[in-house]
Protein backbone atom coordinates (compact mmCIF):
# COMPACT_ATOMS: atom_id res chain seq x y z
CA UNK A 1 0.00 0.00 0.00
CA UNK A 2 1.40 3.41 -0.93
CA UNK A 3 1.92 6.14 1.65
CA UNK A 4 -0.92 8.16 0.11
CA UNK A 5 -3.29 5.17 0.27
CA UNK A 6 -2.40 4.59 3.96
CA UNK A 7 -3.10 8.25 4.77
CA UNK A 8 -6.44 8.15 2.93
CA UNK A 9 -7.40 4.85 4.62
CA UNK A 10 -6.44 6.16 8.07
CA UNK A 11 -8.50 9.29 7.50
CA UNK A 12 -11.50 7.26 6.34
CA UNK A 13 -11.30 5.05 9.44
CA UNK A 14 -11.10 8.09 11.72
CA UNK A 15 -14.10 9.72 10.02
CA UNK A 16 -16.12 6.48 10.24
CA UNK A 17 -15.30 6.04 13.94
CA UNK A 18 -16.23 9.64 14.70
CA UNK A 19 -19.48 9.20 12.78
CA UNK A 20 -20.42 6.07 14.72
CA UNK A 21 -19.72 7.80 18.03
CA UNK A 22 -21.67 10.90 17.00
CA UNK A 23 -24.60 8.77 15.86
CA UNK A 24 -24.68 7.00 19.19
CA UNK A 25 -23.99 3.65 17.52
CA UNK A 26 -21.14 3.00 19.94
CA UNK A 27 -20.64 3.91 23.54
CA UNK A 28 -17.37 4.24 25.36
CA UNK A 29 -16.30 1.79 28.03
CA UNK A 30 -13.07 0.81 29.76
CA UNK A 31 -10.81 3.69 30.72
CA UNK A 32 -13.12 6.18 29.00
CA UNK A 33 -16.10 4.91 31.00
CA UNK A 34 -15.51 7.69 33.45
CA UNK A 35 -14.20 5.35 36.11
CA UNK A 36 -17.66 3.86 36.53
CA UNK A 37 -17.97 0.13 37.25
CA UNK A 38 -20.18 -0.34 34.16
CA UNK A 39 -21.65 1.83 31.44
CA UNK A 40 -25.08 1.05 30.02
CA UNK A 41 -26.16 -1.20 32.88
CA UNK A 42 -27.60 -0.30 36.26
CA UNK A 43 -24.71 -0.19 38.74
CA UNK A 44 -25.05 -2.35 41.86
CA UNK A 45 -25.97 -0.17 44.85
CA UNK A 46 -22.74 -0.97 46.71
CA UNK A 47 -20.63 0.21 43.74
CA UNK A 48 -22.41 3.48 42.96
CA UNK A 49 -20.20 6.57 43.19
CA UNK A 50 -21.63 9.79 44.60
CA UNK A 51 -22.75 12.29 42.00
CA UNK A 52 -21.53 15.86 42.47
CA UNK A 53 -23.98 18.39 43.87
CA UNK A 54 -25.18 20.38 40.88
CA UNK A 55 -27.02 23.66 40.81
CA UNK A 56 -27.16 26.58 38.45
CA UNK A 57 -29.16 29.02 36.38
CA UNK A 58 -31.71 27.46 34.05
CA UNK A 59 -32.22 28.47 30.44
CA UNK A 60 -35.31 30.42 31.52
CA UNK A 61 -33.37 32.35 34.18
CA UNK A 62 -34.54 30.39 37.23
CA UNK A 63 -32.40 28.44 39.67
CA UNK A 64 -32.19 24.65 39.83
CA UNK A 65 -30.67 22.81 42.79
CA UNK A 66 -30.42 19.07 42.06
CA UNK A 67 -29.54 18.13 45.70
CA UNK A 68 -32.98 19.44 46.72
CA UNK A 69 -34.38 16.47 44.75
CA UNK A 70 -32.77 13.88 47.07
CA UNK A 71 -35.16 11.02 47.65
CA UNK A 72 -36.11 11.07 43.96
CA UNK A 73 -34.50 9.31 41.02
CA UNK A 74 -32.95 11.98 38.78
CA UNK A 75 -32.13 11.68 35.09
CA UNK A 76 -29.40 14.15 34.13
CA UNK A 77 -28.65 14.67 30.43
CA UNK A 78 -25.70 16.63 29.01
CA UNK A 79 -26.64 18.03 25.60
CA UNK A 80 -26.28 20.91 23.15
CA UNK A 81 -28.49 22.15 20.32
CA UNK A 82 -25.45 21.89 18.00
CA UNK A 83 -25.23 18.13 18.70
CA UNK A 84 -26.94 16.05 15.96
CA UNK A 85 -27.48 12.95 18.17
CA UNK A 86 -28.98 15.25 20.84
CA UNK A 87 -31.66 16.30 18.36
CA UNK A 88 -32.66 12.67 17.88
CA UNK A 89 -32.46 11.93 21.60
CA UNK A 90 -34.43 14.99 22.81
CA UNK A 91 -37.88 13.55 22.00
CA UNK A 92 -36.88 10.23 23.64
CA UNK A 93 -35.95 11.98 26.87
CA UNK A 94 -39.13 14.07 26.79
CA UNK A 95 -41.26 10.92 26.34
CA UNK A 96 -39.56 9.00 29.17
CA UNK A 97 -39.84 12.07 31.42
CA UNK A 98 -43.59 12.24 30.85
CA UNK A 99 -44.09 8.49 31.20
CA UNK A 100 -42.11 8.09 34.45
CA UNK A 101 -43.41 11.16 36.25
CA UNK A 102 -45.80 8.94 38.25
CA UNK A 103 -42.74 7.20 39.75
CA UNK A 104 -41.48 10.53 41.11
CA UNK A 105 -38.61 10.63 38.62
CA UNK A 106 -37.15 14.08 37.99
CA UNK A 107 -35.35 15.08 34.79
CA UNK A 108 -32.85 17.89 34.25
CA UNK A 109 -30.62 18.86 31.37
CA UNK A 110 -27.20 20.44 31.26
CA UNK A 111 -26.95 22.56 28.09
CA UNK A 112 -23.25 22.77 27.29
CA UNK A 113 -20.97 24.93 25.15
CA UNK A 114 -23.54 27.38 23.82
CA UNK A 115 -25.52 30.54 24.45
CA UNK A 116 -28.66 29.91 26.55
CA UNK A 117 -30.91 31.29 23.78
CA UNK A 118 -29.88 28.43 21.45
CA UNK A 119 -30.65 25.91 24.19
CA UNK A 120 -34.02 27.48 24.91
CA UNK A 121 -34.96 27.32 21.21
CA UNK A 122 -34.01 23.62 21.23
CA UNK A 123 -36.19 22.93 24.28
CA UNK A 124 -39.15 24.66 22.67
CA UNK A 125 -38.69 22.87 19.34
CA UNK A 126 -38.56 19.42 20.96
CA UNK A 127 -41.11 20.14 23.72
CA UNK A 128 -38.68 19.32 26.53
CA UNK A 129 -40.84 19.28 29.71
CA UNK A 130 -38.04 19.68 32.26
CA UNK A 131 -35.51 22.40 33.16
CA UNK A 132 -31.96 22.63 31.85
CA UNK A 133 -29.04 24.40 33.47
CA UNK A 134 -26.94 26.56 31.16
CA UNK A 135 -23.27 25.50 31.24
CA UNK A 136 -21.51 27.25 28.34
CA UNK A 137 -18.06 26.64 29.86
CA UNK A 138 -18.54 22.89 30.51
CA UNK A 139 -17.86 23.48 34.22
CA UNK A 140 -20.48 21.03 35.49
CA UNK A 141 -19.06 18.10 33.52
CA UNK A 142 -15.66 18.70 35.13
CA UNK A 143 -17.26 18.30 38.58
CA UNK A 144 -17.94 14.64 37.75
CA UNK A 145 -14.17 14.05 37.90
CA UNK A 146 -13.33 10.47 36.90
CA UNK A 147 -16.99 9.89 35.98
CA UNK A 148 -17.15 12.87 33.57
CA UNK A 149 -19.20 12.54 30.38
CA UNK A 150 -17.17 10.87 27.62
CA UNK A 151 -19.40 12.05 24.74
CA UNK A 152 -22.23 14.42 23.90
CA UNK A 153 -24.93 13.56 24.65
CA UNK A 154 -24.32 11.76 27.94
CA UNK A 155 -27.01 10.66 30.36
CA UNK A 156 -26.80 9.75 34.04
CA UNK A 157 -29.42 8.33 36.36
CA UNK A 158 -28.85 9.39 39.95
CA UNK A 159 -30.57 7.37 42.65
CA UNK A 160 -32.50 8.82 45.58
CA UNK A 161 -29.34 8.80 47.71
CA UNK A 162 -27.44 11.00 45.25
CA UNK A 163 -25.34 8.22 43.68
CA UNK A 164 -24.73 7.51 39.99
CA UNK A 165 -26.80 4.41 39.24
CA UNK A 166 -26.52 4.36 35.42
CA UNK A 167 -24.58 6.17 32.72
CA UNK A 168 -24.63 6.19 28.95
CA UNK A 169 -22.18 8.10 26.76
CA UNK A 170 -23.77 8.83 23.37
CA UNK A 171 -27.43 8.96 22.37
CA UNK A 172 -29.66 6.61 24.35
CA UNK A 173 -32.77 4.91 23.03
CA UNK A 174 -36.26 4.83 24.46
CA UNK A 175 -36.03 1.18 25.51
CA UNK A 176 -32.60 1.60 27.15
CA UNK A 177 -33.58 4.67 29.11
CA UNK A 178 -37.08 3.57 30.10
CA UNK A 179 -35.79 0.23 31.39
CA UNK A 180 -32.93 1.79 33.36
CA UNK A 181 -35.12 4.55 34.86
CA UNK A 182 -37.76 2.04 35.93
CA UNK A 183 -35.15 -0.28 37.45
CA UNK A 184 -33.50 2.50 39.47
CA UNK A 185 -36.80 4.14 40.51
CA UNK A 186 -38.33 0.82 41.62
CA UNK A 187 -35.42 -1.10 43.22
What are these regions (language model features)?
Residues 1-53, 187:
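N-terminal targeting signals for export/organelle localization
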Residues 36-38, 55-61, 138:
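Short gly/ser/thr-rich secondary-structure transition/capping motifs
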Residues 64-87, 93:
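Short active-site neighborhood of thiol/selenol oxidoreductases, capturing the structured segment around
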Residues 46, 53-74, 144:
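A short beta-strand-turn-helix
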Residues 121-129, 136-187:
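Thiol/disulfide oxidoreductase modules built on the thioredoxin-like
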Residues 87-126, 136-143:
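Structural microenvironment flanking redox-active thiols in thiol-disulfide oxidoreductases
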